[in-house]
A protein has these predicted regions:
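Thiol/disulfide oxidoreductase modules built on the thioredoxin-like
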Residues: 162, 169-220
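Alpha/beta-hydrolase fold active-site loops
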Residues: 105-106, 188
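Oxidative protein folding and maturation machinery
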Residues: 1-104
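Conserved helix-turn-beta segment immediately C-terminal to the redox Cys motif
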Residues: 104-105, 122-143, 158, 213, ...
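Conserved redox-active cysteine motifs that mediate thiol-disulfide chemistry
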Residues: 102, 110-127, 144, 148
Length: 222
């Protein structure tokens, strides 16, 4: 029963900082040598990840931003532009994104910091983004404020070193945007708009399922 309780607690941890605190406290209570060795290794890996996150956030610069509907937060050294979005109509957010990234396709990723499937898909998103760097497409990640703090949002972006445009969006605006795309599936939700401005329902269900050839065809409306 005690073991089960510890597992539940660890899976509920929100950020690497929370996980490091949990592991540090757990190590003091472990007496079995091989288990202790395992936890010490995990704790070391977590602290290394936490150090990387903090370094990335500390190295981030102030951003003047280029989105009329959003407040700029920072620009990281790994290519992420962070903004907050509130007190604006969802329709304005969408139209302004189209105007800002004119002649580009938009890959919209609706997510939350507590969403396991969202986080699991991030490495695939980062991979396909790198593969289409030479293509006219903007990756825009919209994190809901529902259950996600701004600090958790920043830490998740730094944890995955996820470049692109990142929006921390008021939950009501995010819900309205998702409704505009007829989404009923919760997080993650993906919406794709090709470079001609046409929304393609169901074009992307999982980032892990995309390959470069498929995605390039989507971008150009083929």
């Amino acid at each position: 029963k005690k073991k089960k309780k510890l597992i539940v607690l660890e899976t509920d941890l929100r950020t690497p900082e929370d996980k490091a605190w949990f592991q540090d406290n757990l190590i003091d209570k472990v007496k079995t040598p091989w288990i202790l060795s395992k936890f010490e290794k995990q704790a070391e890996e977590t602290h290394q990840k936490l150090a990387m996150i903090n370094q990335s956030l500390n190295n981030a610069k102030a951003s003047i931003g280029n989105l009329s509907f959003a407040t700029p937060v920072m620009k990281t050294d790994f290519g992420a532009d962070l903004y907050t979005v509130s007190d604006v109509e969802a329709s304005e957010v969408l139209s302004s994104m189209r105007e800002t990234f004119k002649n580009k396709a938009l890959m919209l990723d609706f997510w939350a910091t507590w969403c396991g499937p969202c986080l699991k898909d991030f490495p695939s998103s980062k991979k396909i983004h790198a593969e289409v760097k030479d293509e006219p497409v903007e990756f825009i990640y919209l994190c809901s404020s529902n259950g996600s703090t701004e600090e958790e949002w920043k830490q998740r972006i730094a944890e995955f070193q996820l470049d692109g445009t990142h929006l921390y969006v008021d939950e009501k605006i995010e819900a309205e945007l998702m409704t505009m795309f007829d989404s009923r599936g919760g997080f993650p939700t993906y919406a794709f708009i090709n470079k001609s401005g046409a929304y393609k329902p169901g074009a992307v269900s999982r980032m892990a399922a995309l390959d470069r050839g498929q995605f390039v065809n989507l971008i150009h409306g083929k």
